[in-house]
Amino acid sequence: MAAPLFDCLIVGGGPAGLAAALGLCRAIRTAVVFDSKSYRNPTEHMHNVSTWDHANPHDYRLAARKELTEGRYNTVTLADVALRKIWKLDSGEFEATDAVGKVWKGRKLILATGVKDEIPELPGYADCWPKSIYHCLFCHGFEERGAPSVGVLAIGPVANPKPAEHLSRLAHNLAKTVTIYTNGNEELAAQLRPSIEKDQWLTLDNRVIKQLHKTDGIPVRVELDDGTTKEEGFLVHAMKTTPRLDFEHNLNLELSAQGTEFVASPPFSETTTPGCFATGDCGMAIKAASMSMSNGSLAAVGVVSQLAFDEKAK
């Protein structure tokens, strides 16, 4: 029996994928949402999302899924399964094979797969992420406001004067003092000093970090190479990310210059592969739930518009 043809295959059951599915519902278009149940950030609370601020992301996903399938809409299918393969066919359609071997076909494809975090090779970092190391101070940090001191890890993508200073000034809204840890990077320390030397609340520490130690709560103990330790209310660091595609494919997607997301043309996020859209974290430089929702909605508009003109051409 031939696989049914959906208007769109949506890969990813997070904020972007669910928002895209809702847009397709509104346009009375059929779609299937593949959700592997593996999500990037295992946090217990989502923030900066109106009406869902400080709510559990699991509860948000449940409510969004219910809205798609148990309310007024009946054109979206939820498939809680990982994919093994996605292939663009000569016809221009997309064919997906899931983990149990079932084949699905769609006229368009929305990737809402998120990203993978590349954990730095710093001892203890993985133990402290994400409970005590924050990549976004709009998503995290408010609950720890008023901390005596917090730290900024100026390593990896933050080993540059602009992001290191930027994150430090944002962190000062939440803490009395801030320490920038350059992890022995003399060149970076020299570049930072002229810009921050007048800030009494900001300290530059150029010693090498030996290890990060998690505590029973949020604070982190930073152990330096000379044997001294300092406890920080939390640490701030944005690690490198790469788009997540855990399946075989022939999509030939182009990466951004930074390699952190797919090239996706605004406003509807179509990739360099016609008919394939990348939305949410895998298609945006700024990665946050509220922006992923908006981006997913726009991707749905792009899909629906293309479908309408495809049908005109026939």
Swiss-Prot record:
Pathway annotation from the record: Mycotoxin biosynthesis
Top EC group: oxidoreductase
S-S pairs: C136-C139
UniProt-annotated binding residues for FAD: 13-16, 35-40, 47, 112, 281, 288-289
Matches recorded under InterPro entries: FAD/NAD-bd_sf (IPR036188), FAD/NAD-binding_dom (IPR023753), Ferredoxin-NADP_redctase_2 (IPR050097)
GO biological process, one term: cellular response to toxic substance
UniProt keyword terms in alphabetical order: Disulfide bond, FAD, Flavoprotein, Oxidoreductase
Example GO molecular function: oxidoreductase activity
Family: Belongs to the class-II pyridine nucleotide-disulfide oxidoreductase family.
Function: Thioredoxin reductase; part of the gene cluster that mediates the biosynthesis of aspirochlorine (or antibiotic A30641), an unusual halogenated spiro compound with distinctive antifungal properties due to selective inhibition of protein biosynthesis, and which is also active against bacteria, viruses, and murine tumor cells. The non-ribosomal peptide synthetase (NRPS) aclP is responsible the formation of the diketopiperazine (DKP) core from the condensation of 2 phenylalanine residues.
Name listed for the protein in its UniProt record: Thioredoxin reductase aclD
Species assigned in the record: Aspergillus oryzae (strain ATCC 42149 / RIB 40)
Gene: aclD
